[in-house]
């Protein structure tokens, strides 16, 4: 009988020990799962308790398992976040699920955010490209504008562009400059600081200095001079002055003048063909300077007869009422000392 009781007790102890071992292994697994959610509870403590329970016996093992469960529940209640309490309680019931499933769920919840950001960045990067590419599509009718701009050009301008001779570029550039005419001006002298004297006029609050050369140097003394007209073409910065001209000073009209002068133009091209053109040139001044006359005549010849295009030699002959004459050579600029005022009878132009 004693042997039977000993055998029964040994079997009971064996069953209890196996049950305690399973309980402790489950408790260790639960502690590992809870360590991810609750502030990293150390698992070594549970293992030590399990070893003590195995040696102590089945009753102590069961009590320790119950105590460990009671110890876990307050630790879960002390978690800082309420959302984590709910998730930990549900996960304690499902201890059999592996830890990898939780990592998958975390990865699934975390991955959509960067994908959305990438999609937003791609859309933002593609949208400005469409804005940049759209303007050329809207501006497609530009060739129509270029054809319209080409049509108004006169044949003389096209011929001047194609038949430009390099040696006449400087003359063409000078005689196509803008010119200024001011009437009824007041001129005064300042103390000369160079060998050339200058008359100062102030039209429109700008001071223009006019070099007195040739006949003008003797005609105009210290001044001041009232009721004068000036024809101004700005020269190169020869005297370190920003705005200065040479000659072109005449007296203001005392009466209205409409004087028509005969203008005869004879032109001989490179092939030897000769053409003649006779017209009238209107003079509206009692006194006109050779500077103004030379500049306006050459500008008219450039616009209408392609002067300094493929032809640039010849003469302009100005015949005076008193029988004298002035001859301007077209291959060079009018000399400064010949820019004084005069009275004109007729004009002859020969272009070669």
Swiss-Prot record:
Biased composition annotated in UniProt, kind: Polar residues: 142-164
Signal sequence extent: 1-30
Compositional bias annotation for Basic and acidic residues: 69-104
Sialyl Lewis X-binding: region residues: 228-326
InterPro entries assigned: Enterotoxin, SSL_OB, Staph/Strept_toxin_CS, Staph_exotoxin, SuperAg_toxin_C, Superantigen_bac, Toxin_b-grasp_Staph/Strep
Any Pfam family matching the protein: Stap_Strp_tox_C
Subcellular localization: Secreted
Keyword presence, Ribonucleoprotein: no
Biased composition (Low complexity): 114-141
Chief location bin: secreted
Keyword set, alphabetical order: Secreted, Signal, Virulence
Region entry Disordered, spans: 61-165
Top-level taxon: Bacteria
Residue spans crossing the bilayer: none
GO cellular component term of the entry, any: extracellular region
Coiled coil segments of this chain: none
Domain remark from Swiss-Prot or TrEMBL: The C-terminal domain contains a V-shape binding site for sialyl Lewis X.
Function: Secreted protein that plays an essential role in immune innate response inhibition by interacting with and inhibiting host TLR2. In turn, bacteria recognition by immune cells is impaired and cytokine production is inhibited. Mechanistically, by interacting with TLR2, blocks ligand binding and thus inhibits activation. Second, by interacting with an already formed TLR2-lipopeptide complex, prevents TLR heterodimerization and downstream signaling. The interaction with host TLR2 does not involve sialyl Lewis X interactions.
Entries under NCBIfam families matching the protein: PRK13335.1
Family: Belongs to the staphylococcal/streptococcal toxin family.
Protein name (record): Staphylococcal superantigen-like 3
Organism: Staphylococcus aureus (strain Newman)
Lineage: Bacteria, Bacillati, Bacillota, Bacilli, Bacillales
Gene encoding the protein: ssl3
């Amino acid at each position: 009988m004693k042997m039977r009781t000993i055998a029964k007790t040994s079997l009971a102890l064996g069953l209890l020990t196996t049950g305690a071992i399973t309980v402790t292994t489950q408790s260790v697994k639960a502690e590992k799962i809870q360590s991810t959610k609750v502030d990293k509870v150390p698992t070594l403590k549970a293992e030590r308790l399990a070893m003590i329970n195995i040696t102590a016996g089945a009753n102590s093992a069961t009590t320790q398992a119950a105590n460990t469960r009671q110890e876990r529940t307050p630790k879960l209640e002390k978690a800082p976040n309420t959302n984590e309490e709910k998730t930990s309680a549900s996960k304690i019931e499902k201890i059999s699920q592996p830890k990898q499933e939780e990592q998958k769920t975390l990865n699934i919840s975390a991955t959509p955010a960067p994908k959305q950001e990438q999609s937003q960045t791609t859309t933002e990067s593609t949208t400005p490209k469409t804005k940049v590419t759209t303007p050329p599509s809207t501006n497609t009718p530009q060739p129509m504008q270029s054809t319209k701009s080409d049509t108004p050009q006169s044949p003389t301008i096209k011929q001047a562009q194609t038949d430009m001779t390099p040696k006449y570029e400087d003359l063409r550039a000078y005689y196509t400059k803008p010119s200024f005419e001011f009437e009824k001006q007041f001129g005064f002298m300042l103390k000369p600081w160079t060998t050339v004297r200058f008359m100062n006029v102030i039209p429109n609050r700008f001071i223009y200095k006019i070099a007195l050369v040739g006949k003008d140097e003797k005609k105009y003394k210290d001044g001041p001079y009232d009721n004068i007209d000036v024809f101004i073409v700005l020269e190169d910065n020869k005297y370190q002055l920003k705005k200065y001209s040479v000659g072109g000073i005449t007296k203001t009209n005392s009466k209205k003048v409409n004087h028509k002068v005969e203008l005869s133009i004879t032109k001989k091209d490179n092939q030897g063909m000769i053409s003649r053109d006779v017209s009238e040139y209107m003079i509206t001044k009692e006194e006109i300077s050779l500077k103004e006359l030379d500049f306006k005549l050459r500008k008219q010849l450039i616009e209408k007869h392609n002067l300094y295009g493929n032809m640039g030699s010849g003469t302009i002959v100005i015949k005076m009422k008193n029988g004298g004459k002035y001859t301007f050579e077209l291959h060079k600029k009018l000399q400064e000392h010949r820019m004084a005022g005069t009275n004109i009878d007729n004009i002859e132009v020969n272009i070669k």
